[in-house]
From Swiss-Prot:
It comes from Shewanella putrefaciens (strain CN-32 / ATCC BAA-453). It is an enzyme of class 3 (hydrolase). GO terms for biological process: peptide catabolic process; proteolysis. Belongs to the peptidase S46 family. PROSITE patterns: V8_SER. Keywords: Aminopeptidase, Hydrolase, Protease, Serine protease, Signal. InterPro entries: Pep_S46, Peptidase_S1_PA, Peptidase_S1_PA_chymotrypsin, V8_ser_AS. GO terms for molecular function: dipeptidyl-peptidase activity; serine-type aminopeptidase activity. The active site is at 80 (charge relay system), 215 (charge relay system), 666 (charge relay system). Catalyzes the removal of dipeptides from the N-terminus of oligopeptides. Shows a strict specificity for acidic residues (Asp or Glu) in the P1 position, and has probably a hydrophobic residue preference at the P2 position. Preferentially cleaves the synthetic substrate Leu-Glu-methylcoumaryl-7-amide (Leu-Glu-MCA) as compared to Leu-Asp-MCA. Its EC number is 3.4.14.-. Residues 1-18 form the signal peptide. The gene is dpp11. This is Asp/Glu-specific dipeptidyl-peptidase.
């Protein structure tokens, strides 16, 4: 182990537990001392203020995170987050996935796609009392009242089409917050390196370390000439954000405090052990089996047809990522006995509960009954749900549901089918063409139907509609007939169905429309049963969470909500880790590692211009002499250090930190202690995958693209001089 890191390692071991938490911004003042311990000097009150720097420069993509980095609406995120935008503009004659893309001027920036959005969170308001006031004890009525109260709040919040508001549940329904976001509807592609840079190492390196991935890309936000959000138009102008991030060209060193801000998707840290067992024993293995079959199928078909390979590139990347995460979760459950750890903590909670007789002693028992029912319902519906996986059937189901919902007043409609939702509804129908191929869709659907036929939970409506009980039925021929007779493969026809009434649907001869009509009552009955169960859980889960929070506080453990796709902040330090016996992983990787991994074949096929820049040592002022702390600093007055920090003499490519992240944090800006951009979050280590269920500070590490690699790529490899000029570059 490097002597230069001894001090850092000692420091880490002392306060590692402090790094846990995906905190709501308003909570930051309560952990100000923790931030200070990490060397994060930006005032905690500033991080709680969504209207000022740096928080108002952090934006959501709906599935990833990004940030403004110029006064002209330039946005930086991960390459894999911009993947569908790159794919949308990729054709066989100009394959931007393979070749990369750089717009040398704003007039050359193409649309990222009809349903790409940027969301800027402007306000987060506690509306718990408004959502939960005077709720019925009847489960279905209770569920509907929560929904209706939420819809009323959303309607009052969305003062015009420029804003998107949502009510989100926190702590499993114990709290509710109204999220108000400015929505940018014209997003354009600006710059993306080739996939052989942005995804260097591919699925082999995914969730692994050391990494050498240039997982970055640039988009731009556009608005109408009046400065307000507008749909795509050629004469739209760049959006001028209220703030944009300072970019620190000197980056960070080992031991430096860092924090990330972003939109983490889902974690399950407060869930019961029985839920973890269900995921481990049935859900994850079942999902992994299906993903693997789909990946193998699309990969084989893509090798025969370049159009398929391009259209399904985004889906393949997403499925491969999910597949590796599932396998990592399953391996991690066995390697670290997380089930045992969770059960032990649950047992301790029950013991504490007995010492607090004023609290409901049956909290877990009551919740377990409902969870068992929920798992049974999920299992029984799983194969029927997948049996409707055809893209065209999914569209038909949604379109018929829209016609049904339009029979109600807008306030009574389900979320997703209100007037506020129709623009995005239309965009999704348009976007189908960019990631759809009849042969692939039909093959995947046939696989799901065969899996459905092989299990006992059969649905009469589906069996009758497709004649599945008839042993003489040739499933392949049956599906060929459906696809050959439908008009839903045509975008104009799909969009026209948005204006059709229920009678038009019910008298249609289109086979997918007819199938959607036939399945509607069954789908609605299942949805109603799920709502009733959700209504029951909306009482049991908050009661459980209230007691758990009290228990956590009694133990002086961090209390923060599970991730739910809303804006959060996590902090930590730049740090390596002991991945297994005698194997310590250093916090930084170098350009040399790209060359060492290069084979010329995917996924280690670095572009020649990148290899040339490395071999010719065209580093410029991006060369970093050392990524370790100066031994003359205070830390080395306490510990024995080398006379000089160990030499690095390269450009840092990726680095590790102990920040707490999960899916959705991809693209999150990584800040130094001053609140300046020093990298982008893009992955986690394989050992850390199980952090969605249980946070282990010893091995939990996030993987980031170093800003110095991004700037070097822009400067010395791709010559994105026009973009470099836009950035507000600072140095230490």
């Amino acid at each position: 182990m490097r002597i230069a890191l001894v001090a850092t390692l000692v420091l880490t071991s002392g306060i590692a537990n402090a790094d846990e938490g995906q905190w709501q911004p308003y909570q930051m003042p309560s952990i100000a001392d923790k931030l200070s311990e990490r060397g994060i000097d930006i005032p905690a009150e500033k991080l709680a203020d969504l209207t000022s720097y740096p928080m108002n420069a952090v934006v959501g993509l709906g599935y990833c995170t990004a940030s403004f980095v110029s006064p002209q609406g330039l946005v930086v995120t991960n390459h894999h987050c911009a993947y569908k935008a790159i794919q949308y503009n990729t054709k066989q004659e100009h394959n931007y996935l393979e070749q990369g893309f750089l717009a040398t001027s704003m007039d050359k920036e193409p649309s990222a796609g009809p349903n790409e959005r940027l969301y800027i969170t402007e306000a987060v308001t506690d509306v718990t009392k408004d959502v939960t006031k005077e709720l019925s004890q009847d489960p279905l009525t209770r569920y509907e009242e929560i929904q209706n109260n939420s819809k009323a709040l959303i309607k009052n919040c969305e003062v015009d089409d420029n804003y998107r508001c949502n009510v989100r549940s926190f702590h499993n329904g114990l709290e509710y917050y109204l999220i108000k976001q400015l929505m940018i509807r014209d997003v354009r592609l600006v710059y993306a390196p080739p996939e052989s840079v942005g995804g260097y190492g591919g699925d082999i390196d995914n969730y692994e370390y050391p990494r050498h991935s240039g997982d970055f890309a640039f988009l731009r936000a556009y608005v109408g000439k009046d400065g307000k959000p507008a749909a795509y138009a050629e004469d739209n102008i760049p959006y001028k954000p209220k703030s944009y991030l300072k970019v620190n060209a000197d980056g960070v060193k080992a031991g430096d405090g860092v924090f990330v801000a972003g939109y983490p998707g889902t974690t399950s840290r407060y869930n019961l052990t029985s839920e973890l067992k269900f995921a481990s024993d049935w859900l994850y293995p079942t999902q992994a089996k299906r993903y693997q079959l789909q990946i193998d199928t699309i990969n084989a078909m893509g090798q025969e047809d370049a159009d398929i390979a391009i259209k399904y590139a985004g889906n393949m990347a997403s499925m491969a990522n999910r597949m590796k995460k599932l396998n990592g979760l399953l391996a991690g459950f066995k390697a670290t006995d997380i089930i045992g750890i969770k059960q032990s903590r649950e047992d301790n909670f029950l013991a504490w509960l007995k010492q607090n007789p004023k609290l409901n002693q049956n909290l877990i028992a009551e919740l377990e009954v409902l969870l068992a029912e929920q798992q049974q319902v999920f299992q029984s519906n799983y194969y029927f749900t997948n049996a409707q996986s055809s893209t065209l059937l999914t569209a038909a189901n949604s379109l018929y549901r829209l016609a049904k919902e339009k029979q109600k007043s807008d306030a009574e409609r389900e979320i997703g089918y209100q007037e506020r939702d129709l623009a995005m509804f239309s965009s999704r129908l348009k976007r189908i063409d960019s990631s759809f191929h009849v042969d692939v869709d039909k093959t995947l659907w046939q696989q799901d139907l065969r899996a459905y036929l092989a299990q006992p939970n059969r649905i009469a409506a589906l069996d009758d509609a497709l004649d599945l009980n008839n042993k003489e039925t040739n499933l392949e021929a049956k599906l060929d007939g459906l696809y050959s007779l439908t008009t839903l493969t045509d975008q104009a026809q799909r969009l026209a169905w948005m204006d059709a009434d229920t009678t038009t649907f019910e008298t249609s001869t289109d086979p997918f429309i007819r199938l959607a009509v036939a399945l509607y009552d069954t789908n609605m009955a299942q949805e109603k049963a799920e709502k009733i169960l959700d209504g029951k859980l909306s009482t049991a889960r908050p009661d459980y969470m209230a007691a758990v929070i009290e228990y956590y506080k009694a133990n002086n453990w961090p209390v923060y909500p599970d991730a739910n796709g809303t804006l959060r902040i996590s902090y930590g330090m730049v740090d390596g880790y002991q991945s297994r016996d005698a194997l310590y992983k250093q916090p930084f990787t170098r350009l040399d590692g790209i060359v060492a991994k290069h084979t010329g074949a995917e996924p280690y096929n670095a572009p020649q211009k990148l290899l040339d820049a490395i071999s010719e040592q065209r580093f410029g002022d991006h060369l970093v002499k050392s990524v370790y702390q100066d031994p003359r600093g205070w830390i080395c007055r306490l510990f024995s250090c080398l006379d000089k920090p160990e030499e690095f003499n390269s450009v840092p490519v990726n680095f590790l930190s102990s920040v707490d992240t999960t899916g959705g944090n991809s693209g999150s800006p990584v800040f130094n202690g001053k609140g300046e951009l020093v990298g982008l979050n893009f992955d986690s280590t394989y050992e850390a995958i199980t952090k969605d269920w249980f946070f282990n500070p010893t091995i939990t590490r996030a993987v980031h693209v170093d800003i110095r690699y991004i700037l070097w790529m822009m400067d010395k490899v791709d010559h994105a001089d026009n973009l470099i000029k836009e950035l507000d570059l600072v140095r230490n």
